[in-house]
Structures are given as structure tokens and as C-alpha cells.
UniProtKB/Swiss-Prot annotation:
Main location: cytoplasm
Cited function: Cell wall formation. Adds enolpyruvyl to UDP-N-acetylglucosamine.
Protein name: UDP-N-acetylglucosamine 1-carboxyvinyltransferase
GO molecular function (one): UDP-N-acetylglucosamine 1-carboxyvinyltransferase activity
Enzyme class: transferase
Length: 430
């Protein structure tokens, strides 16, 4: 099992290219199930979750061609991948694969819309709270589907003639449930109106792609999305938007380690709340023609309180990274998590590096310290793992992060990108 070794104390200076967003790429890939034509996606990151979803889609009948060939391109960024699903050959999504990644559960929407029935295992993925599927079930039921849970699977069936458009308001904002209901509604009869919809940029990206495929979706990016059903979708070519979580992660790494870095192929507008929070913490951030520049030279890190919220609020996927930054602040800060329960598993690992953090319910109190000290630590989930890397960049001595397969799920060549900017980061294979 691989480990990441970090020698702290080095500023970051240089250019870091930002990859395509994993959280956008996954639903876009799943949308290929909605058409028998070819969906071509550009700027697809090379990540473990993307590779796993390719396998899952292949089981359903999707032919996958990477950069025009059917082999993996290990040495290239921004891959172009062609997805063609002439016929759906299997409407069952097995526990063996779905349990490894929660987002693969989202195939339930396109399979139900195109084939009228499917059997999908209940999901797995990051160990962050319960993440119930109730919202998915309720949304699809509103479109006329019958849903039955049996032996760890959901058996879903559309009414004769297909799904039927309806008005439905989610009781709680859910990005995944919004993705699924939006995809399913594209082929439903009549008009669907989704209330309390997720407003994340990844939802807008999916809607733009579906519209390019012939869907009729309006309102994406607002709390109300309207979908006029069509009889079929065609192929399209679409570029995956930049990864705002990767952007924020590297911005926080620079704020932690110090230095001057340009983040290329991204957009400040994708994470305005996080950028403003970093400015309050003492980082100097400015937009560039193709991204953003972040500097922190000499000045200390100021304590800032945050509360995670759905977009446009502070992203839960940057909470662990920001907490790592606050461990070196000049005072006391508070981090309150409102999206997921049990998303403080990184706290005890940060404490091994010398962080002073106390928990009270869903709020963490962080007392900034003058120095962190390197130590062996263990990744517990995707975002927590990178928070340990950020802390290691500023810790005295050597930090080793184990279980880095979590990192490989969501960060493309992290150690390479950091090393190019002067960090001492090394992957150790065992």
C-alpha cells in the first residue's frame, strides 16, 4: 500500500495546472447511458474513481475509448474520452462495484429513464455519515416509478410508457439527488419542476451537457430547475469544468506553506466564498486570464470561522483542508459542519502533528499553534487525506501519510504538482 512522504518547511512557488472536476466528470459520464449516440467528454481527470466508473459503465454496455483509443493514457492530463452506449446490455448495477463508490449509484436515473426498469445496489464510497438514499427514491417516485428495496438492492420500475413529469421539492438540498432526477426527467413525458435543487456549478455543467444532447433544461444554478421531457437524446461534445475543490485545496496549501503560485485552467468565480475566506485569513488572491494567483509571503495566518453550506456557501469538501490551515493561525477559529455528520475524522490525525482541536457536536474549535511537527498519520477519507498533506507541508520534519488510495480517488498527480512548486513530497510504494 502506497504512502506519501512530506518534508515540511518549503514554500510553494510556480504554476499548478488544475484538472477537470471529478464531481462534474462522474455525472457527465453517467449521462452517456441516456443516448445510443457518442458522448465525448474533454478535460476528464485521471483518477481512481473515473477508472472505476468506466468499468461500471462498461458492464451496462458503454464502449469507452480514451483519446480515441481503447487504452489508458497514464502520462497525460486533460484526457478526451468517448462514451458510446448503443444498447444497454445489463440493467443491474452490482454490489461488488457500486459499494466501492457512491456516485455509481446515480446510474439508477438514466437506466430507469431509458430502459424502464433497473436493479441497483445500495451505495458505498467515503465513510462520511449515513448519506441516505431517501431523496433519490422520493424524487424518482414523484416521476411515477415504483421503488422496492430487496436484499440490499433497489428494484425500480417506470410506469408503462415511461416516467411522467411532475413537480417535486427536495426536503433537503442534495447534489446527487438533483443530478439523478434531472437526468431521469430529460426522457420523461411532460414537464418536471425540481424545487430546492442543488445550485452547484457541477449541476450547471451537467445541465449544459444534457442540453447539448437535446434536453430542454432551464434554471440550473438556481433553486428551481425545469425540464421539458423529450423522446430521445443525441450525442454531444462537452468539456468538463475545472475542479473548484482542487483549486481551493492548492490555494490553501500555498496559504499554509507560503509562496507565490499561479493556478491555471480554473476560475475564481467557481469558489468565491472560499476565496473570500482565504483573503480574510491573510492570503493575497487575484484573478488571472486563465485562473488565479495566490501569495502569502511573510505574513501570518489569521483565524477565521466558517460554516459549511450548499453552494454558494463554503464547500464541505474544503472543510478539512481549511481546518488544517487554521491549525497554524494566530488565534482561535471555529469550523462548523452542516452538510455531513461524522466529517471530523481528520481531527485526531491532525492532533498527531501537534494541532489543538476540540470537538463539540458539529463544531470544531481550533487553537492555532506556532509549529506543527511531522509524524506518521493515516488518511480516513478523500478530503481528510489531503488536509494531512497540507499540514505536512508546514510541519517541522517528516510526515508520512498512509492509505493514500483515498487521495488517488480525487486528486490527479498531487505529489507531482506540489513537487514542481518546490515541495518535498514523495510517493513510496510498498
Amino acid at each position: 500500500m502506497d504512502r506519501i512522504r512530506i518534508v515540511g518547511g518549503n514554500e510553494l512557488n510556480g504554476i499548478i495546472p488544475i484538472s477537470g472536476a471529478k464531481n462534474a466528470a462522474l455525472p457527465l459520464m453517467i449521462a452517456s447511458l441516456l443516448t445510443s449516440d457518442t458522448l465525448t467528454l474533454e478535460n476528464v481527470p485521471h483518477l481512481a474513481d473515473v477508472e472505476l466508473l468506466m468499468r461500471i459503465l462498461g458492464n451496462h454496455g458503454v464502449d469507452v475509448a480514451v483519446n480515441g483509443r481503447r487504452e489508458r493514457q497514464e502520462d497525460s492530463y486533460a484526457r478526451t474520452i468517448h462514451f458510446t452506449c448503443r444498447t444497454i446490455v445489463d440493467t443491474t448495477a452490482s454490489y461488488e462495484l457500486v459499494s466501492k463508490m457512491r456516485a455509481s449509484f446515480w446510474v439508477i436515473g438514466p437506466l430507469l429513464a431509458r430502459e424502464g426498469h433497473c436493479r441497483v445496489s445500495l451505495p458505498g464510497g467515503c465513510a462520511i455519515g449515513t448519506r441516505p438514499v431517501d431523496l433519490f427514491i422520493e424524487g424518482l417516485t414523484a416521476l411515477g416509478a415504483t421503488m422496492e428495496i430487496d436484499a440490499g438492492y433497489i428494484n425500480a420500475k417506470a410506469p408503462d410508457g415511461g416516467l411522467i413529469g411532475a413537480r417535486y421539492t427536495f426536503p433537503k438540498v442534495s447534489v446527487g439527488a438533483t443530478h439523478v432526477m434531472m437526468m431521469a426527467a430529460t426522457l420523461a413525458r411532460g414537464t418536471t419542476v425540481i424545487g430546492n435543487a442543488a445550485r452547484e456549478p457541477e449541476v450547471v455543467d451537467l445541465a449544459n451537457c444534457l442540453n447539448a444532447m437535446g434536453a430542454k433544461i432551464s434554471g440550473a444554478g438556481t433553486a428551481t430547475i425545469t425540464i421539458e421531457g423529450v423522446t430521445s437524446l443525441s450525442g454531444a461534445r462537452h468539456r468538463v469544468l475545472p475542479d473548484r475543490i482542487e483549486t481551493g485545496t492548492y490555494a490553501m496549501a500555498v496559504a499554509m506553506a507560503g509562496g507565490d503560485v499561479v493556478l491555471e485552467n480554473t476560475d475564481v468565480a467557481l469558489l468565491e466564498t472560499a476565496v473570500e475566506t482565504l483573503r480574510r485569513a491573510g492570503a493575497d488572491i487575484s484573478a488571472t486570464n486563465n485562473g488565479m494567483r495566490i501569495k502569502r509571503n511573510g505574513a501570518g495566518i489569521k483565524p477565521v470561522d466558517i460554516v459549511t453550506d450548499p453552494f454558494p456557501g463554503f464547500p464541505t469538501d474544503l472543510q478539512a483542508q481549511f481546518m488544517a490551515l487554521m491549525t497554524r493561525s494566530s488565534g482561535i477559529s471555529h469550523v462548523t459542519e452542516t452538510i455531513f455528520e461524522n466529517r471530523f475524522m481528520h481531527v485526531q490525525e491532525l492532533a498527531r502533528l501537534g494541532a489543538r482541536i476540540t470537538l463539540s457536536g458539529q463544531t470544531a474549535k481550533i487553537e492555532g499553534v506556532q509549529r506543527l511537527r511531522g509524524a506518521p498519520v493515516m488518511a480516513t477519507d478523500l478530503r481528510a487525506s489531503v488536509s494531512l498533506v497540507i499540514a505536512g507541508l508546514a510541519a517541522e520534519g517528516e510526515t508520512t501519510v498512509s492509505r493514500v488510495y483515498h487521495l488517488d480517488r480525487g486528486f490527479e498527480r498531487l505529489e507531482e504538482k506540489l513537487t514542481r512548486c518546490g515541495a518535498v513530497v514523495q510517493r513510496i510504494s510498498e
